[in-house]
Swiss-Prot record:
Keyword Chloroplast: no
This protein's UniProt keywords: Chromatin regulator, Cytoplasm, Nucleus, Repeat, WD repeat
Species name: Neurospora crassa (strain ATCC 24698 / 74-OR23-1A / CBS 708.71 / DSM 1257 / FGSC 987)
Family, as annotated: Belongs to the WD repeat RBAP46/RBAP48/MSI1 family.
Keyword Oxidoreductase: no
Protein name according to UniProt: Histone acetyltransferase type B subunit 2
Gene Ontology molecular function, alphabetical: histone binding
InterPro entries attached to this UniProt entry: G-protein_beta_WD-40_rep, Histone-bd_RBBP4-like_N, WD40/YVTN_repeat-like_dom_sf, WD40_repeat_CS, WD40_repeat_dom_sf, WD40_rpt, WD_repeat_RBAP46/RBAP48/MSI1
Residue segments, region Interaction with the histone H4 N-terminus: 372-376
Amino acid sequence: MARDEIVDDVDVNMEEDDAEAEQRLINEEYKIWKKNSPFLYDMMLSTALEWPTLTTQWFPDVKNPKDKSHTVHRLLLGTHTAEGKPNYLQIAEVEIPKMVELNPRDYDEERGEIGGYGSKASSGEPLCIRFKITQKIDHPGEVNKARYQPQNPDIIATLAVDGRVLIFDRTKHSITPSGTPSPQLELIGHKEEGFGLNWNPHEEGCLVTGSEDKTVLLWDLKTYEGTSKQLKYSRKYTHHSHIVNDVQHHPLVKSWIGTVSDDLTLQIIDVRRPETDKAAIVARNGHSDAINALAFNPRVETIIATASADKTIGIWDMRNMKSKVHTLEGHQDAVTSLEWHPTESAILGSGSYDRRLLFWDISRVGDEQTQDDAEDGPPELLFMHGGHTNHLADFSWNRNDPWLVCSAAEDNLLQIWKVANSIVSKEPADMSTPELDDPKPKQSSH
């Protein structure tokens, strides 16, 4: 046997050993998280999907059935199946138990708390979340991203792996798949696949997309004339020099669109300007690796967050984009998803390849800490969700139930959960929390 073949075998064996050691560590961390979870969550559901989803979003509606102890919410999901298997755009119904008035008779002596994850209401019913897929719509290839139109949530846009942007009207499809993908409209313009997709919250029928072909495209469904199922973009931007990873309309300023790229820049387009080869604002030198996502603060119009492969999150103030206002450090791998809390303007969620979803409270930046607290992370690190054992793919805040989150990992695991009120409430909890086991990395709490 040649010497280089022996070296190759050694390298392979070392890689296998490293992978096994990493998996053992992941499994151990998961066991610790599972043991601690009754103290960390008011409710939790982990469900194994048939296939992983790369995308998740709560629909804006909620039903409140009479004489029922739950509310009914809906989720938008996709699939990422194995080679040769069909893919679907999926809609799920989720029954969320109503939070009951705490009753001293529900006190759990073993855990030393009232109510909480896994407890029962005074009626004796367990506080359990129920999940079921209610509609499957055929989709060509995996769903890179799916988002509903805010003005009409039955209209859904998806990013396909061939670069097409597909528009589906959910009401025009049966609840079971037909076997043939049949979107209402195909938006043609990108030459490569992408993950950047965002509807215009100010104008119905308009959306923006970003792609690995380095372009940002604007679309206006109102220009569709019905002669074919295809529609061309209304405007093409070429201001980035590398892959465009994420795009977002500003939620408060109609003419602004934010874009981020592997070229390490955050850029702001002003659609009122005629030029399409440069942005109105360019923020450089904020990150040392690709910028994967951005999020405009929905309540403070000048604040933007960026997520990077350099493991950090940048906080920017649009009044001075020469440098970041602050850097959030706590993830151990690339940060890939960002979303601000829908009602708490200082709360930001971030998902990462490190399998963690972190909650940050920007209002705590600079707060004094004890040495013990500092070991758990910076003062603005509010909470660490450690329930996933694979890369975070996407997550979504529920707009009808504060602090209710859906998170999806690149394995089949989908989790629907609500962090314990004692951790995120402004006032300290009345009852002390028992001492938790010490996971690595540490769970962050008050």
